[in-house]
Amino acid sequence: MDCKYLLELLDSYSFIRSSRSFSSPIIIHGVAGCGKSTIIQKIALAFPELLIGSFTPALLDSNSGRKQLAVTSDPLDILDEYLGGPNPVVRLAKFCDPLQYSCEQPEVPHFTSLLTWRFCVRTTALLNGIFGCQIKSRREDLCHLTHENPYTTDPKGVVVAHEQEVINLLLQHGCPVTPTQHLWGLTIPVVSVYITSIASLSTVDRANLFLSLTRDSKALHIFEFDAWSHATC
């Protein structure tokens, strides 16, 4: 019964069935904002006996305060964010967004979704151009997205960076900075992202670049040093 309900939820949230033969556990890949968390919460409420775990445990039921279990070697029914570490035995399903992990060979999914309520069309166009993906936005509103000169323009909102040399430089100039890794699963209205080079990071550090560019909900200001280095010559 839990498998049937899961398949119904995947269909209702427009997940696409792949050509992989049906097997257990069901592998489900979806971009942030596609409904993965909501699906997990709904199946947890419908079948409270299920053991649902994650490497970054999230809330399952706001009324009871029930959270996902922290992953150990013990078997689970559902594993969220399965690329986060060594997997125990999983019976029913594994969920993940491969774009948020540096994994060259994630499991072949049974179901996928690139439809998002999280990112507007401006953000999806940016992400698709950088990462070569095909994310589609379901949002009607538009966020504010700008490319700023890091040498002449002050940041707005929360300053985010993940490269240590960039973090050190910002701190030397008295600019408070939040490492991208500390913002996992969070969104902030206005974000200023400082990075060395989008082109190089899209090859060598795709996961952290993706996370850095997807923390905002209203405005994203990108400060890319290499894009403006000629201005200092």
Curated annotation (Swiss-Prot):
The keyword Ribosomal protein does not apply. One of its GO terms (molecular function) is ATP binding. Disulfide bonds: none annotated. InterPro entries: (+)RNA_virus_helicase_core_dom, P-loop_NTPase. It comes from the Viruses. One of its GO terms (biological process) is symbiont-mediated suppression of host innate immune response. SUPFAM superfamilies: P-loop containing nucleoside triphosphate hydrolases. Pfam families: Viral_helicase1. Belongs to the Tymovirales TGBp1 protein family. TGBp1, TGBp2 and TGBp3 seem to act together for cell-to-cell propagation. TGBp1 is the main movement protein that physically cross the plasmodesma with the viral genome. TGBp2 and TGBp3 would facilitate TGBp1 function. Transports viral genome to neighboring plant cells directly through plasmosdesmata, without any budding. The movement protein allows efficient cell to cell propagation, by bypassing the host cell wall barrier. Increases plasmodesma size exclusion limit. Acts as a suppressor of RNA-mediated gene silencing, also known as post-transcriptional gene silencing (PTGS), a mechanism of plant viral defense that limits the accumulation of viral RNAs. This is Movement and silencing protein TGBp1. It comes from Narcissus mosaic virus. The lineage of its organism: Viruses, Riboviria, Orthornavirae, Kitrinoviricota, Alsuviricetes.
